[in-house]
């Protein structure tokens, strides 16, 4: 407990912003011992933050570009007053709240990858700058009783807070364009989601998708 609350944060705040190849090597040597599992040739640029890395499996040849935040669910998460709508994803095959990243993956700069509901990123996936992936977020009403007044921030303790838990899977070869937001579902193999799109549901294999909500407009590859 002391390690998680005091020692680890101190070490991470010190090594986080060391620039260049030296910083990458230091962060790799540190985090490969903190991840649940970790491959080789993992590059972690300056400013990257990992929250609950012990619930993350990281493959080989993975590059985390600067100033991204990757967070899994901590074991002590307080969900007591949360009304959680759980959205099923049949492609999701790891524990809720965990993150698994495959091989040959590039995570763009200023990404937010929030794995409270669970995220699987398969091999050869690319996320461009400022991509946001939220597998657990607040919801505008209670799915079981839409007449009930609910709230949308975790500081509310005396009333109900409505949430949605939506595990996310990015299949092999997926590319998310600049500023894409993913809020749920499975993105099919070799699909591309265009800049500024918002994805809230499944996307079939080999899709070229755009819009809010994002829809397939054509095949990516002929």
Stretches found by the model and what they are:
Residues 175, 181-182, 188, 192-199, ...:
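A generic "structured core" feature
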Residues 209:
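Conserved active-site beta-strand element of glycosyltransferases/polysaccharide synthases
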Residues 201, 218:
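Short helix N-cap motif at coil->helix boundaries in the Bergerat
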Residues 51-58, 63-187, 212, 220-221:
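Flexible, glycine/small-residue-enriched loop-and-beta-strand segment within the central core
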Residues 197, 213-215:
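A short, acidic, flexible beta-alpha connecting loop/helix-capping segment that sits on the rim
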Residues 1-51:
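Extended, small-residue-rich solenoid/repeat segments and analogous flexible loops
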């Amino acid at each position: 407990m002391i390690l998680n609350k005091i020692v680890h944060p101190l070490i991470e705040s010190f090594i986080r912003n060391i620039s260049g190849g030296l910083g990458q090597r230091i962060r790799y040597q540190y985090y490969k011992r903190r991840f649940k599992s970790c491959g080789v040739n993992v590059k972690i640029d300056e400013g990257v933050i990992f929250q609950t890395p012990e619930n993350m499996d990281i493959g080989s040849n993975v590059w985390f570009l600067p100033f991204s935040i990757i967070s899994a669910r901590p074991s002590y998460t307080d969900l007591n007053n949360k009304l959680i709508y759980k959205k099923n994803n049949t492609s999701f095959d790891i524990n809720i709240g965990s993150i698994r990243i495959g091989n040959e993956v590039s995570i763009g700069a200023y990404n937010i990858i929030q794995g409270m509901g669970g995220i699987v990123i398969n091999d050869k996936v690319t996320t461009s700058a400022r991509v946001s992936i939220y597998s657990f977020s607040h919801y505008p009403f209670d799915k079981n009783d839409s007449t009930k007044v609910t709230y949308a921030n975790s500081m509310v303790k005396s009333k109900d807070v409505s949430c949605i838990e939506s595990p996310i899977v990015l299949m092999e070869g997926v590319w998310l364009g600049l500023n894409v937001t993913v809020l749920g579902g499975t993105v099919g193999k070799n699909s591309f989601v265009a800049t500024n799109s918002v994805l809230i549901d499944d996307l079939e294999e080999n899709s070229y998708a755009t819009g809010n909500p994002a829809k397939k407009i054509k095949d990516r590859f002929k």
